[in-house]
């Protein structure tokens, strides 16, 4: 099947993927043929489909494509016939989903190809959280421990503090056994000891911030949903929702060194917090007066919202601008949906931002900025982990 080349933007489409993935129950890489010529070209990925229902026999087909890797100006543009993915459109009329979240919204804005695969065609990676990379496992265990501690003590901060100090080792070990088995491997024993020490200190500081500021815990992993103009139904799950004087306060937990989120706040790019704030204010009919990232390994709370809470472990960050991130995201949602309905899916990781139509239109359309590559701020970021690299014709 030939693809129609209609331009030179950084948009890349594979018709066979959208035609066949909807029929697939399981997908296996069979072969990957790489050719090297004047330009480096990847070509001829074969996938094996195990089909549902009556069509149960194995089928092998070739996904033929031609993608130049390297020089962005030679990147070809492909368009897909809307009829080819009619099954998906029937299930999600106009690519509309029943409900969106921060994760799906951000994926649509930053990596539309992954949005279509993950959220429309349900092509997902079902790897167990307990067997993820070590830092992801640490984050999962930390989240689970705080959630368990909150519910076990009826959201009472004093009781949480007492149990945390008296029974931390026993309780966190139970969480590790069920959600962090990777930490129990022999080669990770020193890592686990450091992790437990960091987590104990971090939760102690967290509970002290809550206690000294006289905050009430509304819920851990608190869920809310509401209708948002310009998007539709939206859902949020907040790591820790608190309240003071009838005003809401949001803590989002991160298990890393915090530089990423420090920069997000400095550059006013903390879309996750903006999404949570807008969903909660409408769903709960209360003002959200404080949102912050709590960096667990550093036991540091980063925020834009000065003067609401006080503690030596709270760091106030001044943003570079006062852009309304949520309104930008709504505009970007509409922009990306229109692209999808016109058969255009951007797959432009590592390419110069200045060459992308999205970037060109960003000022006039007031769009949310694209993430930049960690090694080159003038290029588009790659998706962490590249879960669909084979489908996009990249090497394993």
Language-model features and meaning:
Residues 3-54, 342-360:
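C-terminal accessory regions
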Residues 1, 47-61, 130-132, 284-288:
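A signal for specific C-terminal beta-sheet/loop modules enriched in small/flexible residues
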Residues 30, 37, 70-396:
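RecB-family 4Fe-4S metal-dependent nuclease core
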Residues 1, 43-44, 101, 266:
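Generic structural signal for alpha-helix starts
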Residues 41-84:
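Helicase C-terminal subdomain and adjacent C-terminal extension
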